[in-house]
């Protein structure tokens, strides 16, 4: 997929598989925007993933913990860090690839009007065996210190309401256009035949 910018809707994708696909695309020169990162899924129960995250939180520099490693709590940064681990980010090529990535919780304004994609090979419903446990990244992030879950939920509700209203208007206009085309079909039959002849 090579386009100017690809917007990926992360809802229902498995974290590792999504990150691997995006890392490959970034290294190939594709610009990627990941939205709705709080809806990413991780295989394994919430309890198990919390234990793993708390083990990760213990990893720090003895003499000065402020020097790293840094433990990001927001879903967008967790995805960013996962992708960073799959890219040679200390080389100029890897650093340039990481610059091509943007990740957001929710769907912020410029991207709410753009076509969003999914990645089939990373979708949980296609990859995880039914009945297996999984958890949502937003919930995990909230339980380890992310404080903006409520705000993102509120903004997403507003966006979905506006989107539903826009879709209803669009559907009405499409129906009106279809009716108008049927109404004038008999009058424009000769013209349409001529246009068909020329491939329009």
Swiss-Prot record:
<keyword id="KW-0689">Ribosomal protein</keyword>
<dbReference type="InterPro" id="IPR036899">
    <property type="entry name" value="Ribosomal_uL13_sf"/>
</dbReference>
<comment type="similarity">
    <text>Belongs to the universal ribosomal protein uL13 family.</text>
</comment>
<keyword id="KW-0687">Ribonucleoprotein</keyword>
<dbReference type="GO" id="GO:0022625">
    <property type="term" value="C:cytosolic large ribosomal subunit"/>
</dbReference>
<dbReference type="GO" id="GO:0017148">
    <property type="term" value="P:negative regulation of translation"/>
</dbReference>
<dbReference type="Pfam" id="PF00572">
    <property type="entry name" value="Ribosomal_L13"/>
</dbReference>
<dbReference type="InterPro" id="IPR023563">
    <property type="entry name" value="Ribosomal_uL13_CS"/>
</dbReference>
<dbReference type="InterPro" id="IPR005755">
    <property type="entry name" value="Ribosomal_uL13_euk/arc"/>
</dbReference>
<dbReference type="GO" id="GO:0003735">
    <property type="term" value="F:structural constituent of ribosome"/>
</dbReference>
<dbReference type="InterPro" id="IPR005822">
    <property type="entry name" value="Ribosomal_uL13"/>
</dbReference>
<dbReference type="GO" id="GO:0006412">
    <property type="term" value="P:translation"/>
</dbReference>
<protein>
    <recommendedName>
        <fullName>Large ribosomal subunit protein uL13</fullName>
    </recommendedName>
</protein>
<dbReference type="GO" id="GO:0003729">
    <property type="term" value="F:mRNA binding"/>
</dbReference>
């Amino acid at each position: 997929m090579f386009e100017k910018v690809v917007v990926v809707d992360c809802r229902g994708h498995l974290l590792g598989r999504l990150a691997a696909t995006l890392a490959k695309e970034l290294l190939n020169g594709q610009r990627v925007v990941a939205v709705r990162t709080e809806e990413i899924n991780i295989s394994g129960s919430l309890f198990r993933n919390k234990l793993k995250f708390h083990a990760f939180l213990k990893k720090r520099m003895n003499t000065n913990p402020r020097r790293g490693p840094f433990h990001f709590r927001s879903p967008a940064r967790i995805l960013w860090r996962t992708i960073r681990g799959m890219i040679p980010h200390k080389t100029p090529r890897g650093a340039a690839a990481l610059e091509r990535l943007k990740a957001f919780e929710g769907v912020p304004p410029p991207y709410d009007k753009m076509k969003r994609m999914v990645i089939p090979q990373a979708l949980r419903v296609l990859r995880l065996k039914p009945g297996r446990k999984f958890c949502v990244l937003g919930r995990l992030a909230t339980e380890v210190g992310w404080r903006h879950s409520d705000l993102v939920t509120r903004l997403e509700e507003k966006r979905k309401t506006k989107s539903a209203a826009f879709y209803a208007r669009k559907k009405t206009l499409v129906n009106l256009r279809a009716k108008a085309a049927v109404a004038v079909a008999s009058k424009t039959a000769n013209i349409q035949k001529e246009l068909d002849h020329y491939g329009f």
